[in-house]
Amino acid sequence: NDRFEKMHHGGRHNHCFSSPIYREKVAIINQKLAERYGHHPALLMWHISNEYSGDCHCAYCQENFRHWLQVKYGTLAALNAAWWGPFWSHTITDWSQIDAPSAIGESMVHGQNLDWKRFVTDQTIDFFEAETKPLKAVTPDVPVTTNFMADTVDLLPFYSLDYGKFAKHVDLISWDCYPAWHNDAMSTADLASKVGFINDQYRSLKQQPFLIMESTPSGVNWHDYNKTKRPGMHTLSSLQFLAHGSDSNLYFQRRKSRGSSEKFHGAVVDHDNSADNRVFQEVAHVGELLEKVQAVKGSDKVARVGMIYDWDNNWALDDAQGFQTQD
């Protein structure tokens, strides 16, 4: 973590993208997957990993960060000029003096904080490419994707990774959309506007239709209040996905888990294992509708308004001490 403490195993994403052993084992697994399933007639695409996120502050990552900076700046003089290091006596005189921003170390050098976020994106993409390489070697014509995310109940673009850069490395965009319908914080119309906006943004990442890789047919388990969709809401929200450029409406999860942290997350098949409840019936209805609207698959959408969203700029403004911002 950012206190340079080695964490115990647990939670999610408890791996290091820099670990040579982890990379080696992932390559072996993916090679075997490609060899076994690569020419199966049911294979449509490869889904790589799951919801990339997080950073690591281990010795491997620190060294990779220093190397990344050396490649970017070339000299310490250039780095100090970019980071304005002499202010507060932060001049770097050796590459080994540089660590990632830390809760127990440096955290006030604006350029360093910004470069760390850029590095995290680049390192994540590099790991994605390492995962993809054995698959592409065996199945060069099978597309690859990974599931992007949104941030928080407000459905803001995911903050921690530059999806604009990441999008160049996937064959198609897919993402996990979990709006908290019927919440007390905003109207259904306001939330629908947020859903529409972020769908438009993710469609624009590659200027082509995308996939909804995860959605819930009922409620989620991680909002403050997790309400089941009202009758008809699942159909309405599913059609909104299509109207904004999605070619799918996939679900997490198909069957509710018997235990652990997401046992109450919505699913197509509930704990009662029944096809008679309203949620299952509405999922079936959406499936029938998708069959009827096959003609819209792959449709282009012409945008009449252009907007710029820049992850670099967002990070920079958020980290600029004293910059006047409004919540």
Language model features: what each stretch is:
Residues I98, D171, W175-D327:
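Carbohydrate-binding surfaces of carbohydrate-active enzymes
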Residues D2-L172, D176-T188, A192-F197:
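Polysaccharide-binding and catalytic clefts of secreted carbohydrate-active enzymes
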